[in-house]
Amino acid sequence: MMWRRISAVLCVVALFAVFTATASAVKYVALGDSYSSGTGTRTFYEPTCQRSVYAYPYLLHNAHPEWTFVNATCAGAKTGDVLNTQVTSVTSDTTWVTYTIGGNDAGFSSVITECAQPSWASNCEGAINTAQSYITNTLPGRLDLVNNAIKSRAPSAKVIVLDYPRLLNGTDCNALTFFSGSEMTRLNQTADMLKNVESAAATRAGANFVFRDVIPPFIGHAVCDGGGGSSTEWINGLSNPTGESYHPKVTGHASGYYPVVKGVTG
C-alpha cells in the first residue's frame, strides 16, 4: 500500500513538472529590417545583418533569458526577404513575433539620400512622391503576405508590428546635408503614412496581431533635437559609416522601441 502511495505521489510530481515545463516554454522570433537588427547602435555581434545586442529584440531576450530566442532580423530586409528567408524561423511553437518592415520596400533610405542633397542636385519631391505612392498602393498587399505567412506557420503566436519614428525635427544641423523645412515635413509625413498602412495591415491580420506606434516616444528625440550629436538625439544624423545614418541609436532602442514592446510582452 505504501509503495502505491509513493508511486502515485511520484506520478503527480512528474506530471506537474511536465506541465510546468510546457507552460513556461516560450519562443520569441524577431523578424525585420535594420530598425530591428540594430543598425545605428554601432556594435554588432553578427556584422553581415548588423544584429546588435543593443537592439530591442536582444533587450527583450535579456529580460527573458529563459525564452528560446531566434533573431532573424537583417539590415536591408524587404518584405520579400521576410517571406523567402526570415519567416522560416517562425515555427508552430512560436509564442511571440516582432518586426519592422516596409521602409526598404518603399525605398526610404534612397529617399533620405536624395533629399539630403542640395535642391539643385536632387529631386527630393519626386523621390518622396514615388515612395508615398508605393506605400499607398503596393505596400498593403505586401504586408498582408507577410502577416499571412506568419499566421500559417504559427497560428497561435502573438505578433507585435512596429512602425518607424519621424526622423527629423524641422531643423537641419548637419553641415553636409541640405534638407529644407518643407522636405523634412514631407519626410515625416511619409513616416506617418507607413504607420497608418502598417496599423491597418495588423488589424486585417486578426486578434493575434498588435500594432504599436513608436512615433510618440521619439518626439523630442529626432535628428538635431538638442543639437547634432547630443544625448537628446535618439536617432543618428549623417554618420560615418553612412549606413548608420538615420537609424536609432542605443538610446533609441532602449528608450524608444523596447518599452513599447515590453508593454505588450511583459
In which residue ranges do the predicted regions lie?
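A structural motif corresponding to the C-terminal end of an alpha-helix
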Residues: H61-W67, G141-I160, T190-R212
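Serine-esterase "nucleophile elbow" of acetyl-processing enzymes
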Residues: S24-T73, T88, Q117-S119
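Oxyanion-hole/transition-state-stabilizing segment in secreted/luminal serine hydrolases
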Residues: T39, D81-I135, R166-L168
